[in-house]
Amino acid sequence: MSLPPVIAIDGPTASGKGTVASLVAEKLGFHYLDSGALYRLVALASEKQGIDVKNGQELGLLVPKLLISFKNSQIFLNGENVTDAIRVESIGLRASALAVHPEIRSALVGLQRSFRQSPGLVADGRDTASVIFPDAILKVFLTATAAARAGRRYKQLIAKGISAKLEDLLQDLQERDARDSSRGVAPLLVADGAKVLETSDLSIDQAVKTVLDWY
């Protein structure tokens, strides 16, 4: 029996891949996996437990102990709604730092693959197109300039009532891009066979339509 189809969407931080992926899933009636949220959940849980972000072994052992669930666009960790808590910049930076550990990536592989259910799945995040779902029917690398991404993130934070400085966000994104692209484990790169979608000058609706047309 053939496995349900997967659309895998990757790209740099704040490229809009999560928004596009969730809307594509909604249009197709597919399940949705935000793999980046899983790393943010590990970041939040490890911070609460005081685990050093450099301790890959201890972080890897933490993953199986976490009770994670996605319900109606809300994300729960051990029964607590942490949808907003995992989106703050400090947790994003911590998630990027701990994602370099192979122990964590290995621990999350099985969890991510469990989301592959009928009628299909749209998965966004690092590794989805190369390691987690190498047989994805469509692989998309969604990108935009650092300036465009910083501007989008700034608007998102301000809309949520969170104070932010555009220049600080731009610097953080540039540093994360450099770290994500150069790390030895799962670096940021275009997967074999992936289509590149540059969204600096595209609206969300235009990006979603492009992905649907490719599918």
UniProtKB/Swiss-Prot annotation:
GO terms for molecular function: ATP binding; CMP kinase activity; dCMP kinase activity. It is found in: Cytoplasm. GO terms for biological process: pyrimidine nucleotide metabolic process. The keyword Transferase applies. Its EC number is 2.7.4.25. ATP binds at residues 11-19. It comes from the Bacteria. It holds the Pfam family Cytidylate_kin. It catalyses: CMP + ATP = CDP + ADP; dCMP + ATP = dCDP + ADP. GO terms for cellular component: cytoplasm. Keywords: ATP-binding, Cytoplasm, Kinase, Nucleotide-binding, Transferase. CDD domains: CMPK. NCBIfam families: cmk. Belongs to the cytidylate kinase family. Type 1 subfamily. This is Cytidylate kinase. It comes from Polynucleobacter necessarius subsp. necessarius (strain STIR1). The gene is cmk.
